[in-house]
Each structure stands twice: as structure tokens, then as C-alpha cells.
Amino acid sequence: MPAQISSEDQQLSTKIAERLKRDEAGLVAAVVQQFDSKEVLMLGWMDDEALRRTLRSGRVTFFSRSRQEYWRKGDTSGHIQMVKAVALDCDGDALLISVDQHGPACHTGTRSCFDGRALPAFVEPVFVEPVA
Amino acid sequence: MPAQISSEDQQLSTKIAERLKRDEAGLVAAVVQQFDSKEVLMLGWMDDEALRRTLRSGRVTFFSRSRQEYWRKGDTSGHIQMVKAVALDCDGDALLISVDQHGPACHTGTRSCFDGRALPAFVEPVFVEPVA
């Protein structure tokens, strides 16, 4: 007699699936943050199955919009992301994935996908006390 | 003679616009992070004009997917986001907006839109040394 496999192992639980507000492609945005330094490493996309794999396996899996396929981060590069925690935002269209990132998160070799990519911006004037 | 207004004041600069990889609705994801605590506060959406306003004004402006209109964060609630820095990721489909958030970021009253909204997840087993 084969071992029973619960439907929860095969599909994202209904309770979570009901809270997702997917875009027209069936995806939600997934913000990936290093758990200790709090650095934002990258943003990827997940459908129900990518989220299920991420929650069940301890490794982050995305759905690639350009390649239209699942990719488990690090399978090619070795730069894996071990899941520390996952949260879904108030309106269900964004996930925050807390991870331990091994090596650089970015395919260009930088630690985060935002490193060295600042845009020119006007920021709030800061009041500076004259040095006495 | 009226003051000259450069095209840069009216439109997002071509240099930045060329780097954006917009979705089918013309939007990129914008991750908002508190500049000092590094907490991820929320995720919003920006088109070219919302990004231009954010870069030029020092206040974060999003484009609402549900209401199909611009909203400058805090205009209704008072919970404004002052821009500290903006970066665009390696493939141009995500922005990281570093801000000083006044009050809660979430419309539900929590500091971040992810607070108290964790999903059950399997995480990497952690090796614990027995206490001697």
C-alpha cells in the first residue's frame, strides 16, 4: 500500500491561496531580504506553485517571467537562498521572504541586485548644526 | 518672459526610462524600506510618472493598480514617506526606495504591511550544541 500523500503536499493550502492577489499572469511579487543584515537582495515573482515549493522545501523557488519556468535560486550558480521566514502583505500581492543568502544574490556578482545602481534623486533637506 | 522649464522637469529622463522593464500595465514594483532600521515597509507600483515625481519631489508617489490613479503616500493619512535614496535593480523591473516613514506604513495601522502576517514555512534545520 503506497504512503498517503496529503493534498497539502501537492497544492498550496486553500487558506493561503485565498489570500493571494495575483496579477494577470498569476504572479505575486516576492521581496527577498537577508535575515540578519536586513539588506534587500532582490525581487522575484511567484505563482502558487513557486510559493508552495518555497514554503515546503526551505529553499526559495521563483517563477521566471522571461523564461516562463520555475527556477530554484542557486541551482545553477550555487548561490542558494535558505528560507528563514515568509510573510504575505495586507492586500496579498507581495511576499517578504527572509533568507540566508549564500554568496551574491545578483547574477552580475554584486551582493544585492540594487548595489551600485542608485538613481539621482532629490531628498529631504537635512538640517546640519554648525560645528562649534 | 516665463521661466524656462527643462524637459527633465516634465518627463522622466530618457536615461532612466530606457532602463525600466515595465510589466504589461506599464508598471515596475517598488520596494519601500525604512532607511535606518532596514525594515521592509511595503510594496507599491510605479509607472514612469510616479517614479519621476518620487525622484523630483522628495516624497514617494505610487500608481494604484486598483484605483488606476497616482497617490502620494501620506496625503490622506499623514503617514508620509520622505525619500532618502532610490535604486533600480539589475534587470530594471524593481525599485528599492529608501525612506523615512512617518507613522505606520500600512493602512491597517501596523508599522509595515508584513507585520504579523507570517506564513507557515519549513525552514533550514539549525544545529544546536547541547548545553554543557
UniProtKB/Swiss-Prot annotation, chains A, B:
It is found in: Cytoplasm. Pfam families: PRA-CH. Coiled coil: none annotated. One of its GO terms (molecular function) is zinc ion binding. Binds 1 Mg(2+) ion per subunit. One of its GO terms (cellular component) is cytoplasm. InterPro entries: PRA-CH (IPR026660), PRib_AMP_CycHydrolase_dom (IPR002496), PRib_AMP_CycHydrolase_sf (IPR038019). Pathway: Amino-acid biosynthesis; L-histidine biosynthesis; L-histidine from 5-phospho-alpha-D-ribose 1-diphosphate: step 3/9. It comes from the Bacteria. Mg(2+) binds at residues 89, 91, 93. The keyword Hydrolase applies. Zn(2+) binds at residues 90, 106, 113. Its cofactor is Mg(2+); Zn(2+). Its EC number is 3.5.4.19. One of its GO terms (biological process) is L-histidine biosynthetic process. Keywords: Amino-acid biosynthesis, Cytoplasm, Histidine biosynthesis, Hydrolase, Magnesium, Metal-binding, Zinc. It catalyses: 1-(5-phospho-beta-D-ribosyl)-5'-AMP + H2O = 1-(5-phospho-beta-D-ribosyl)-5-[(5-phospho-beta-D-ribosylamino)methylideneamino]imidazole-4-carboxamide. Homodimer. Belongs to the PRA-CH family. Catalyzes the hydrolysis of the adenine ring of phosphoribosyl-AMP. PANTHER family: HISTIDINE BIOSYNTHESIS BIFUNCTIONAL PROTEIN, PHOSPHORIBOSYL-AMP CYCLOHYDROLASE. This is Phosphoribosyl-AMP cyclohydrolase.
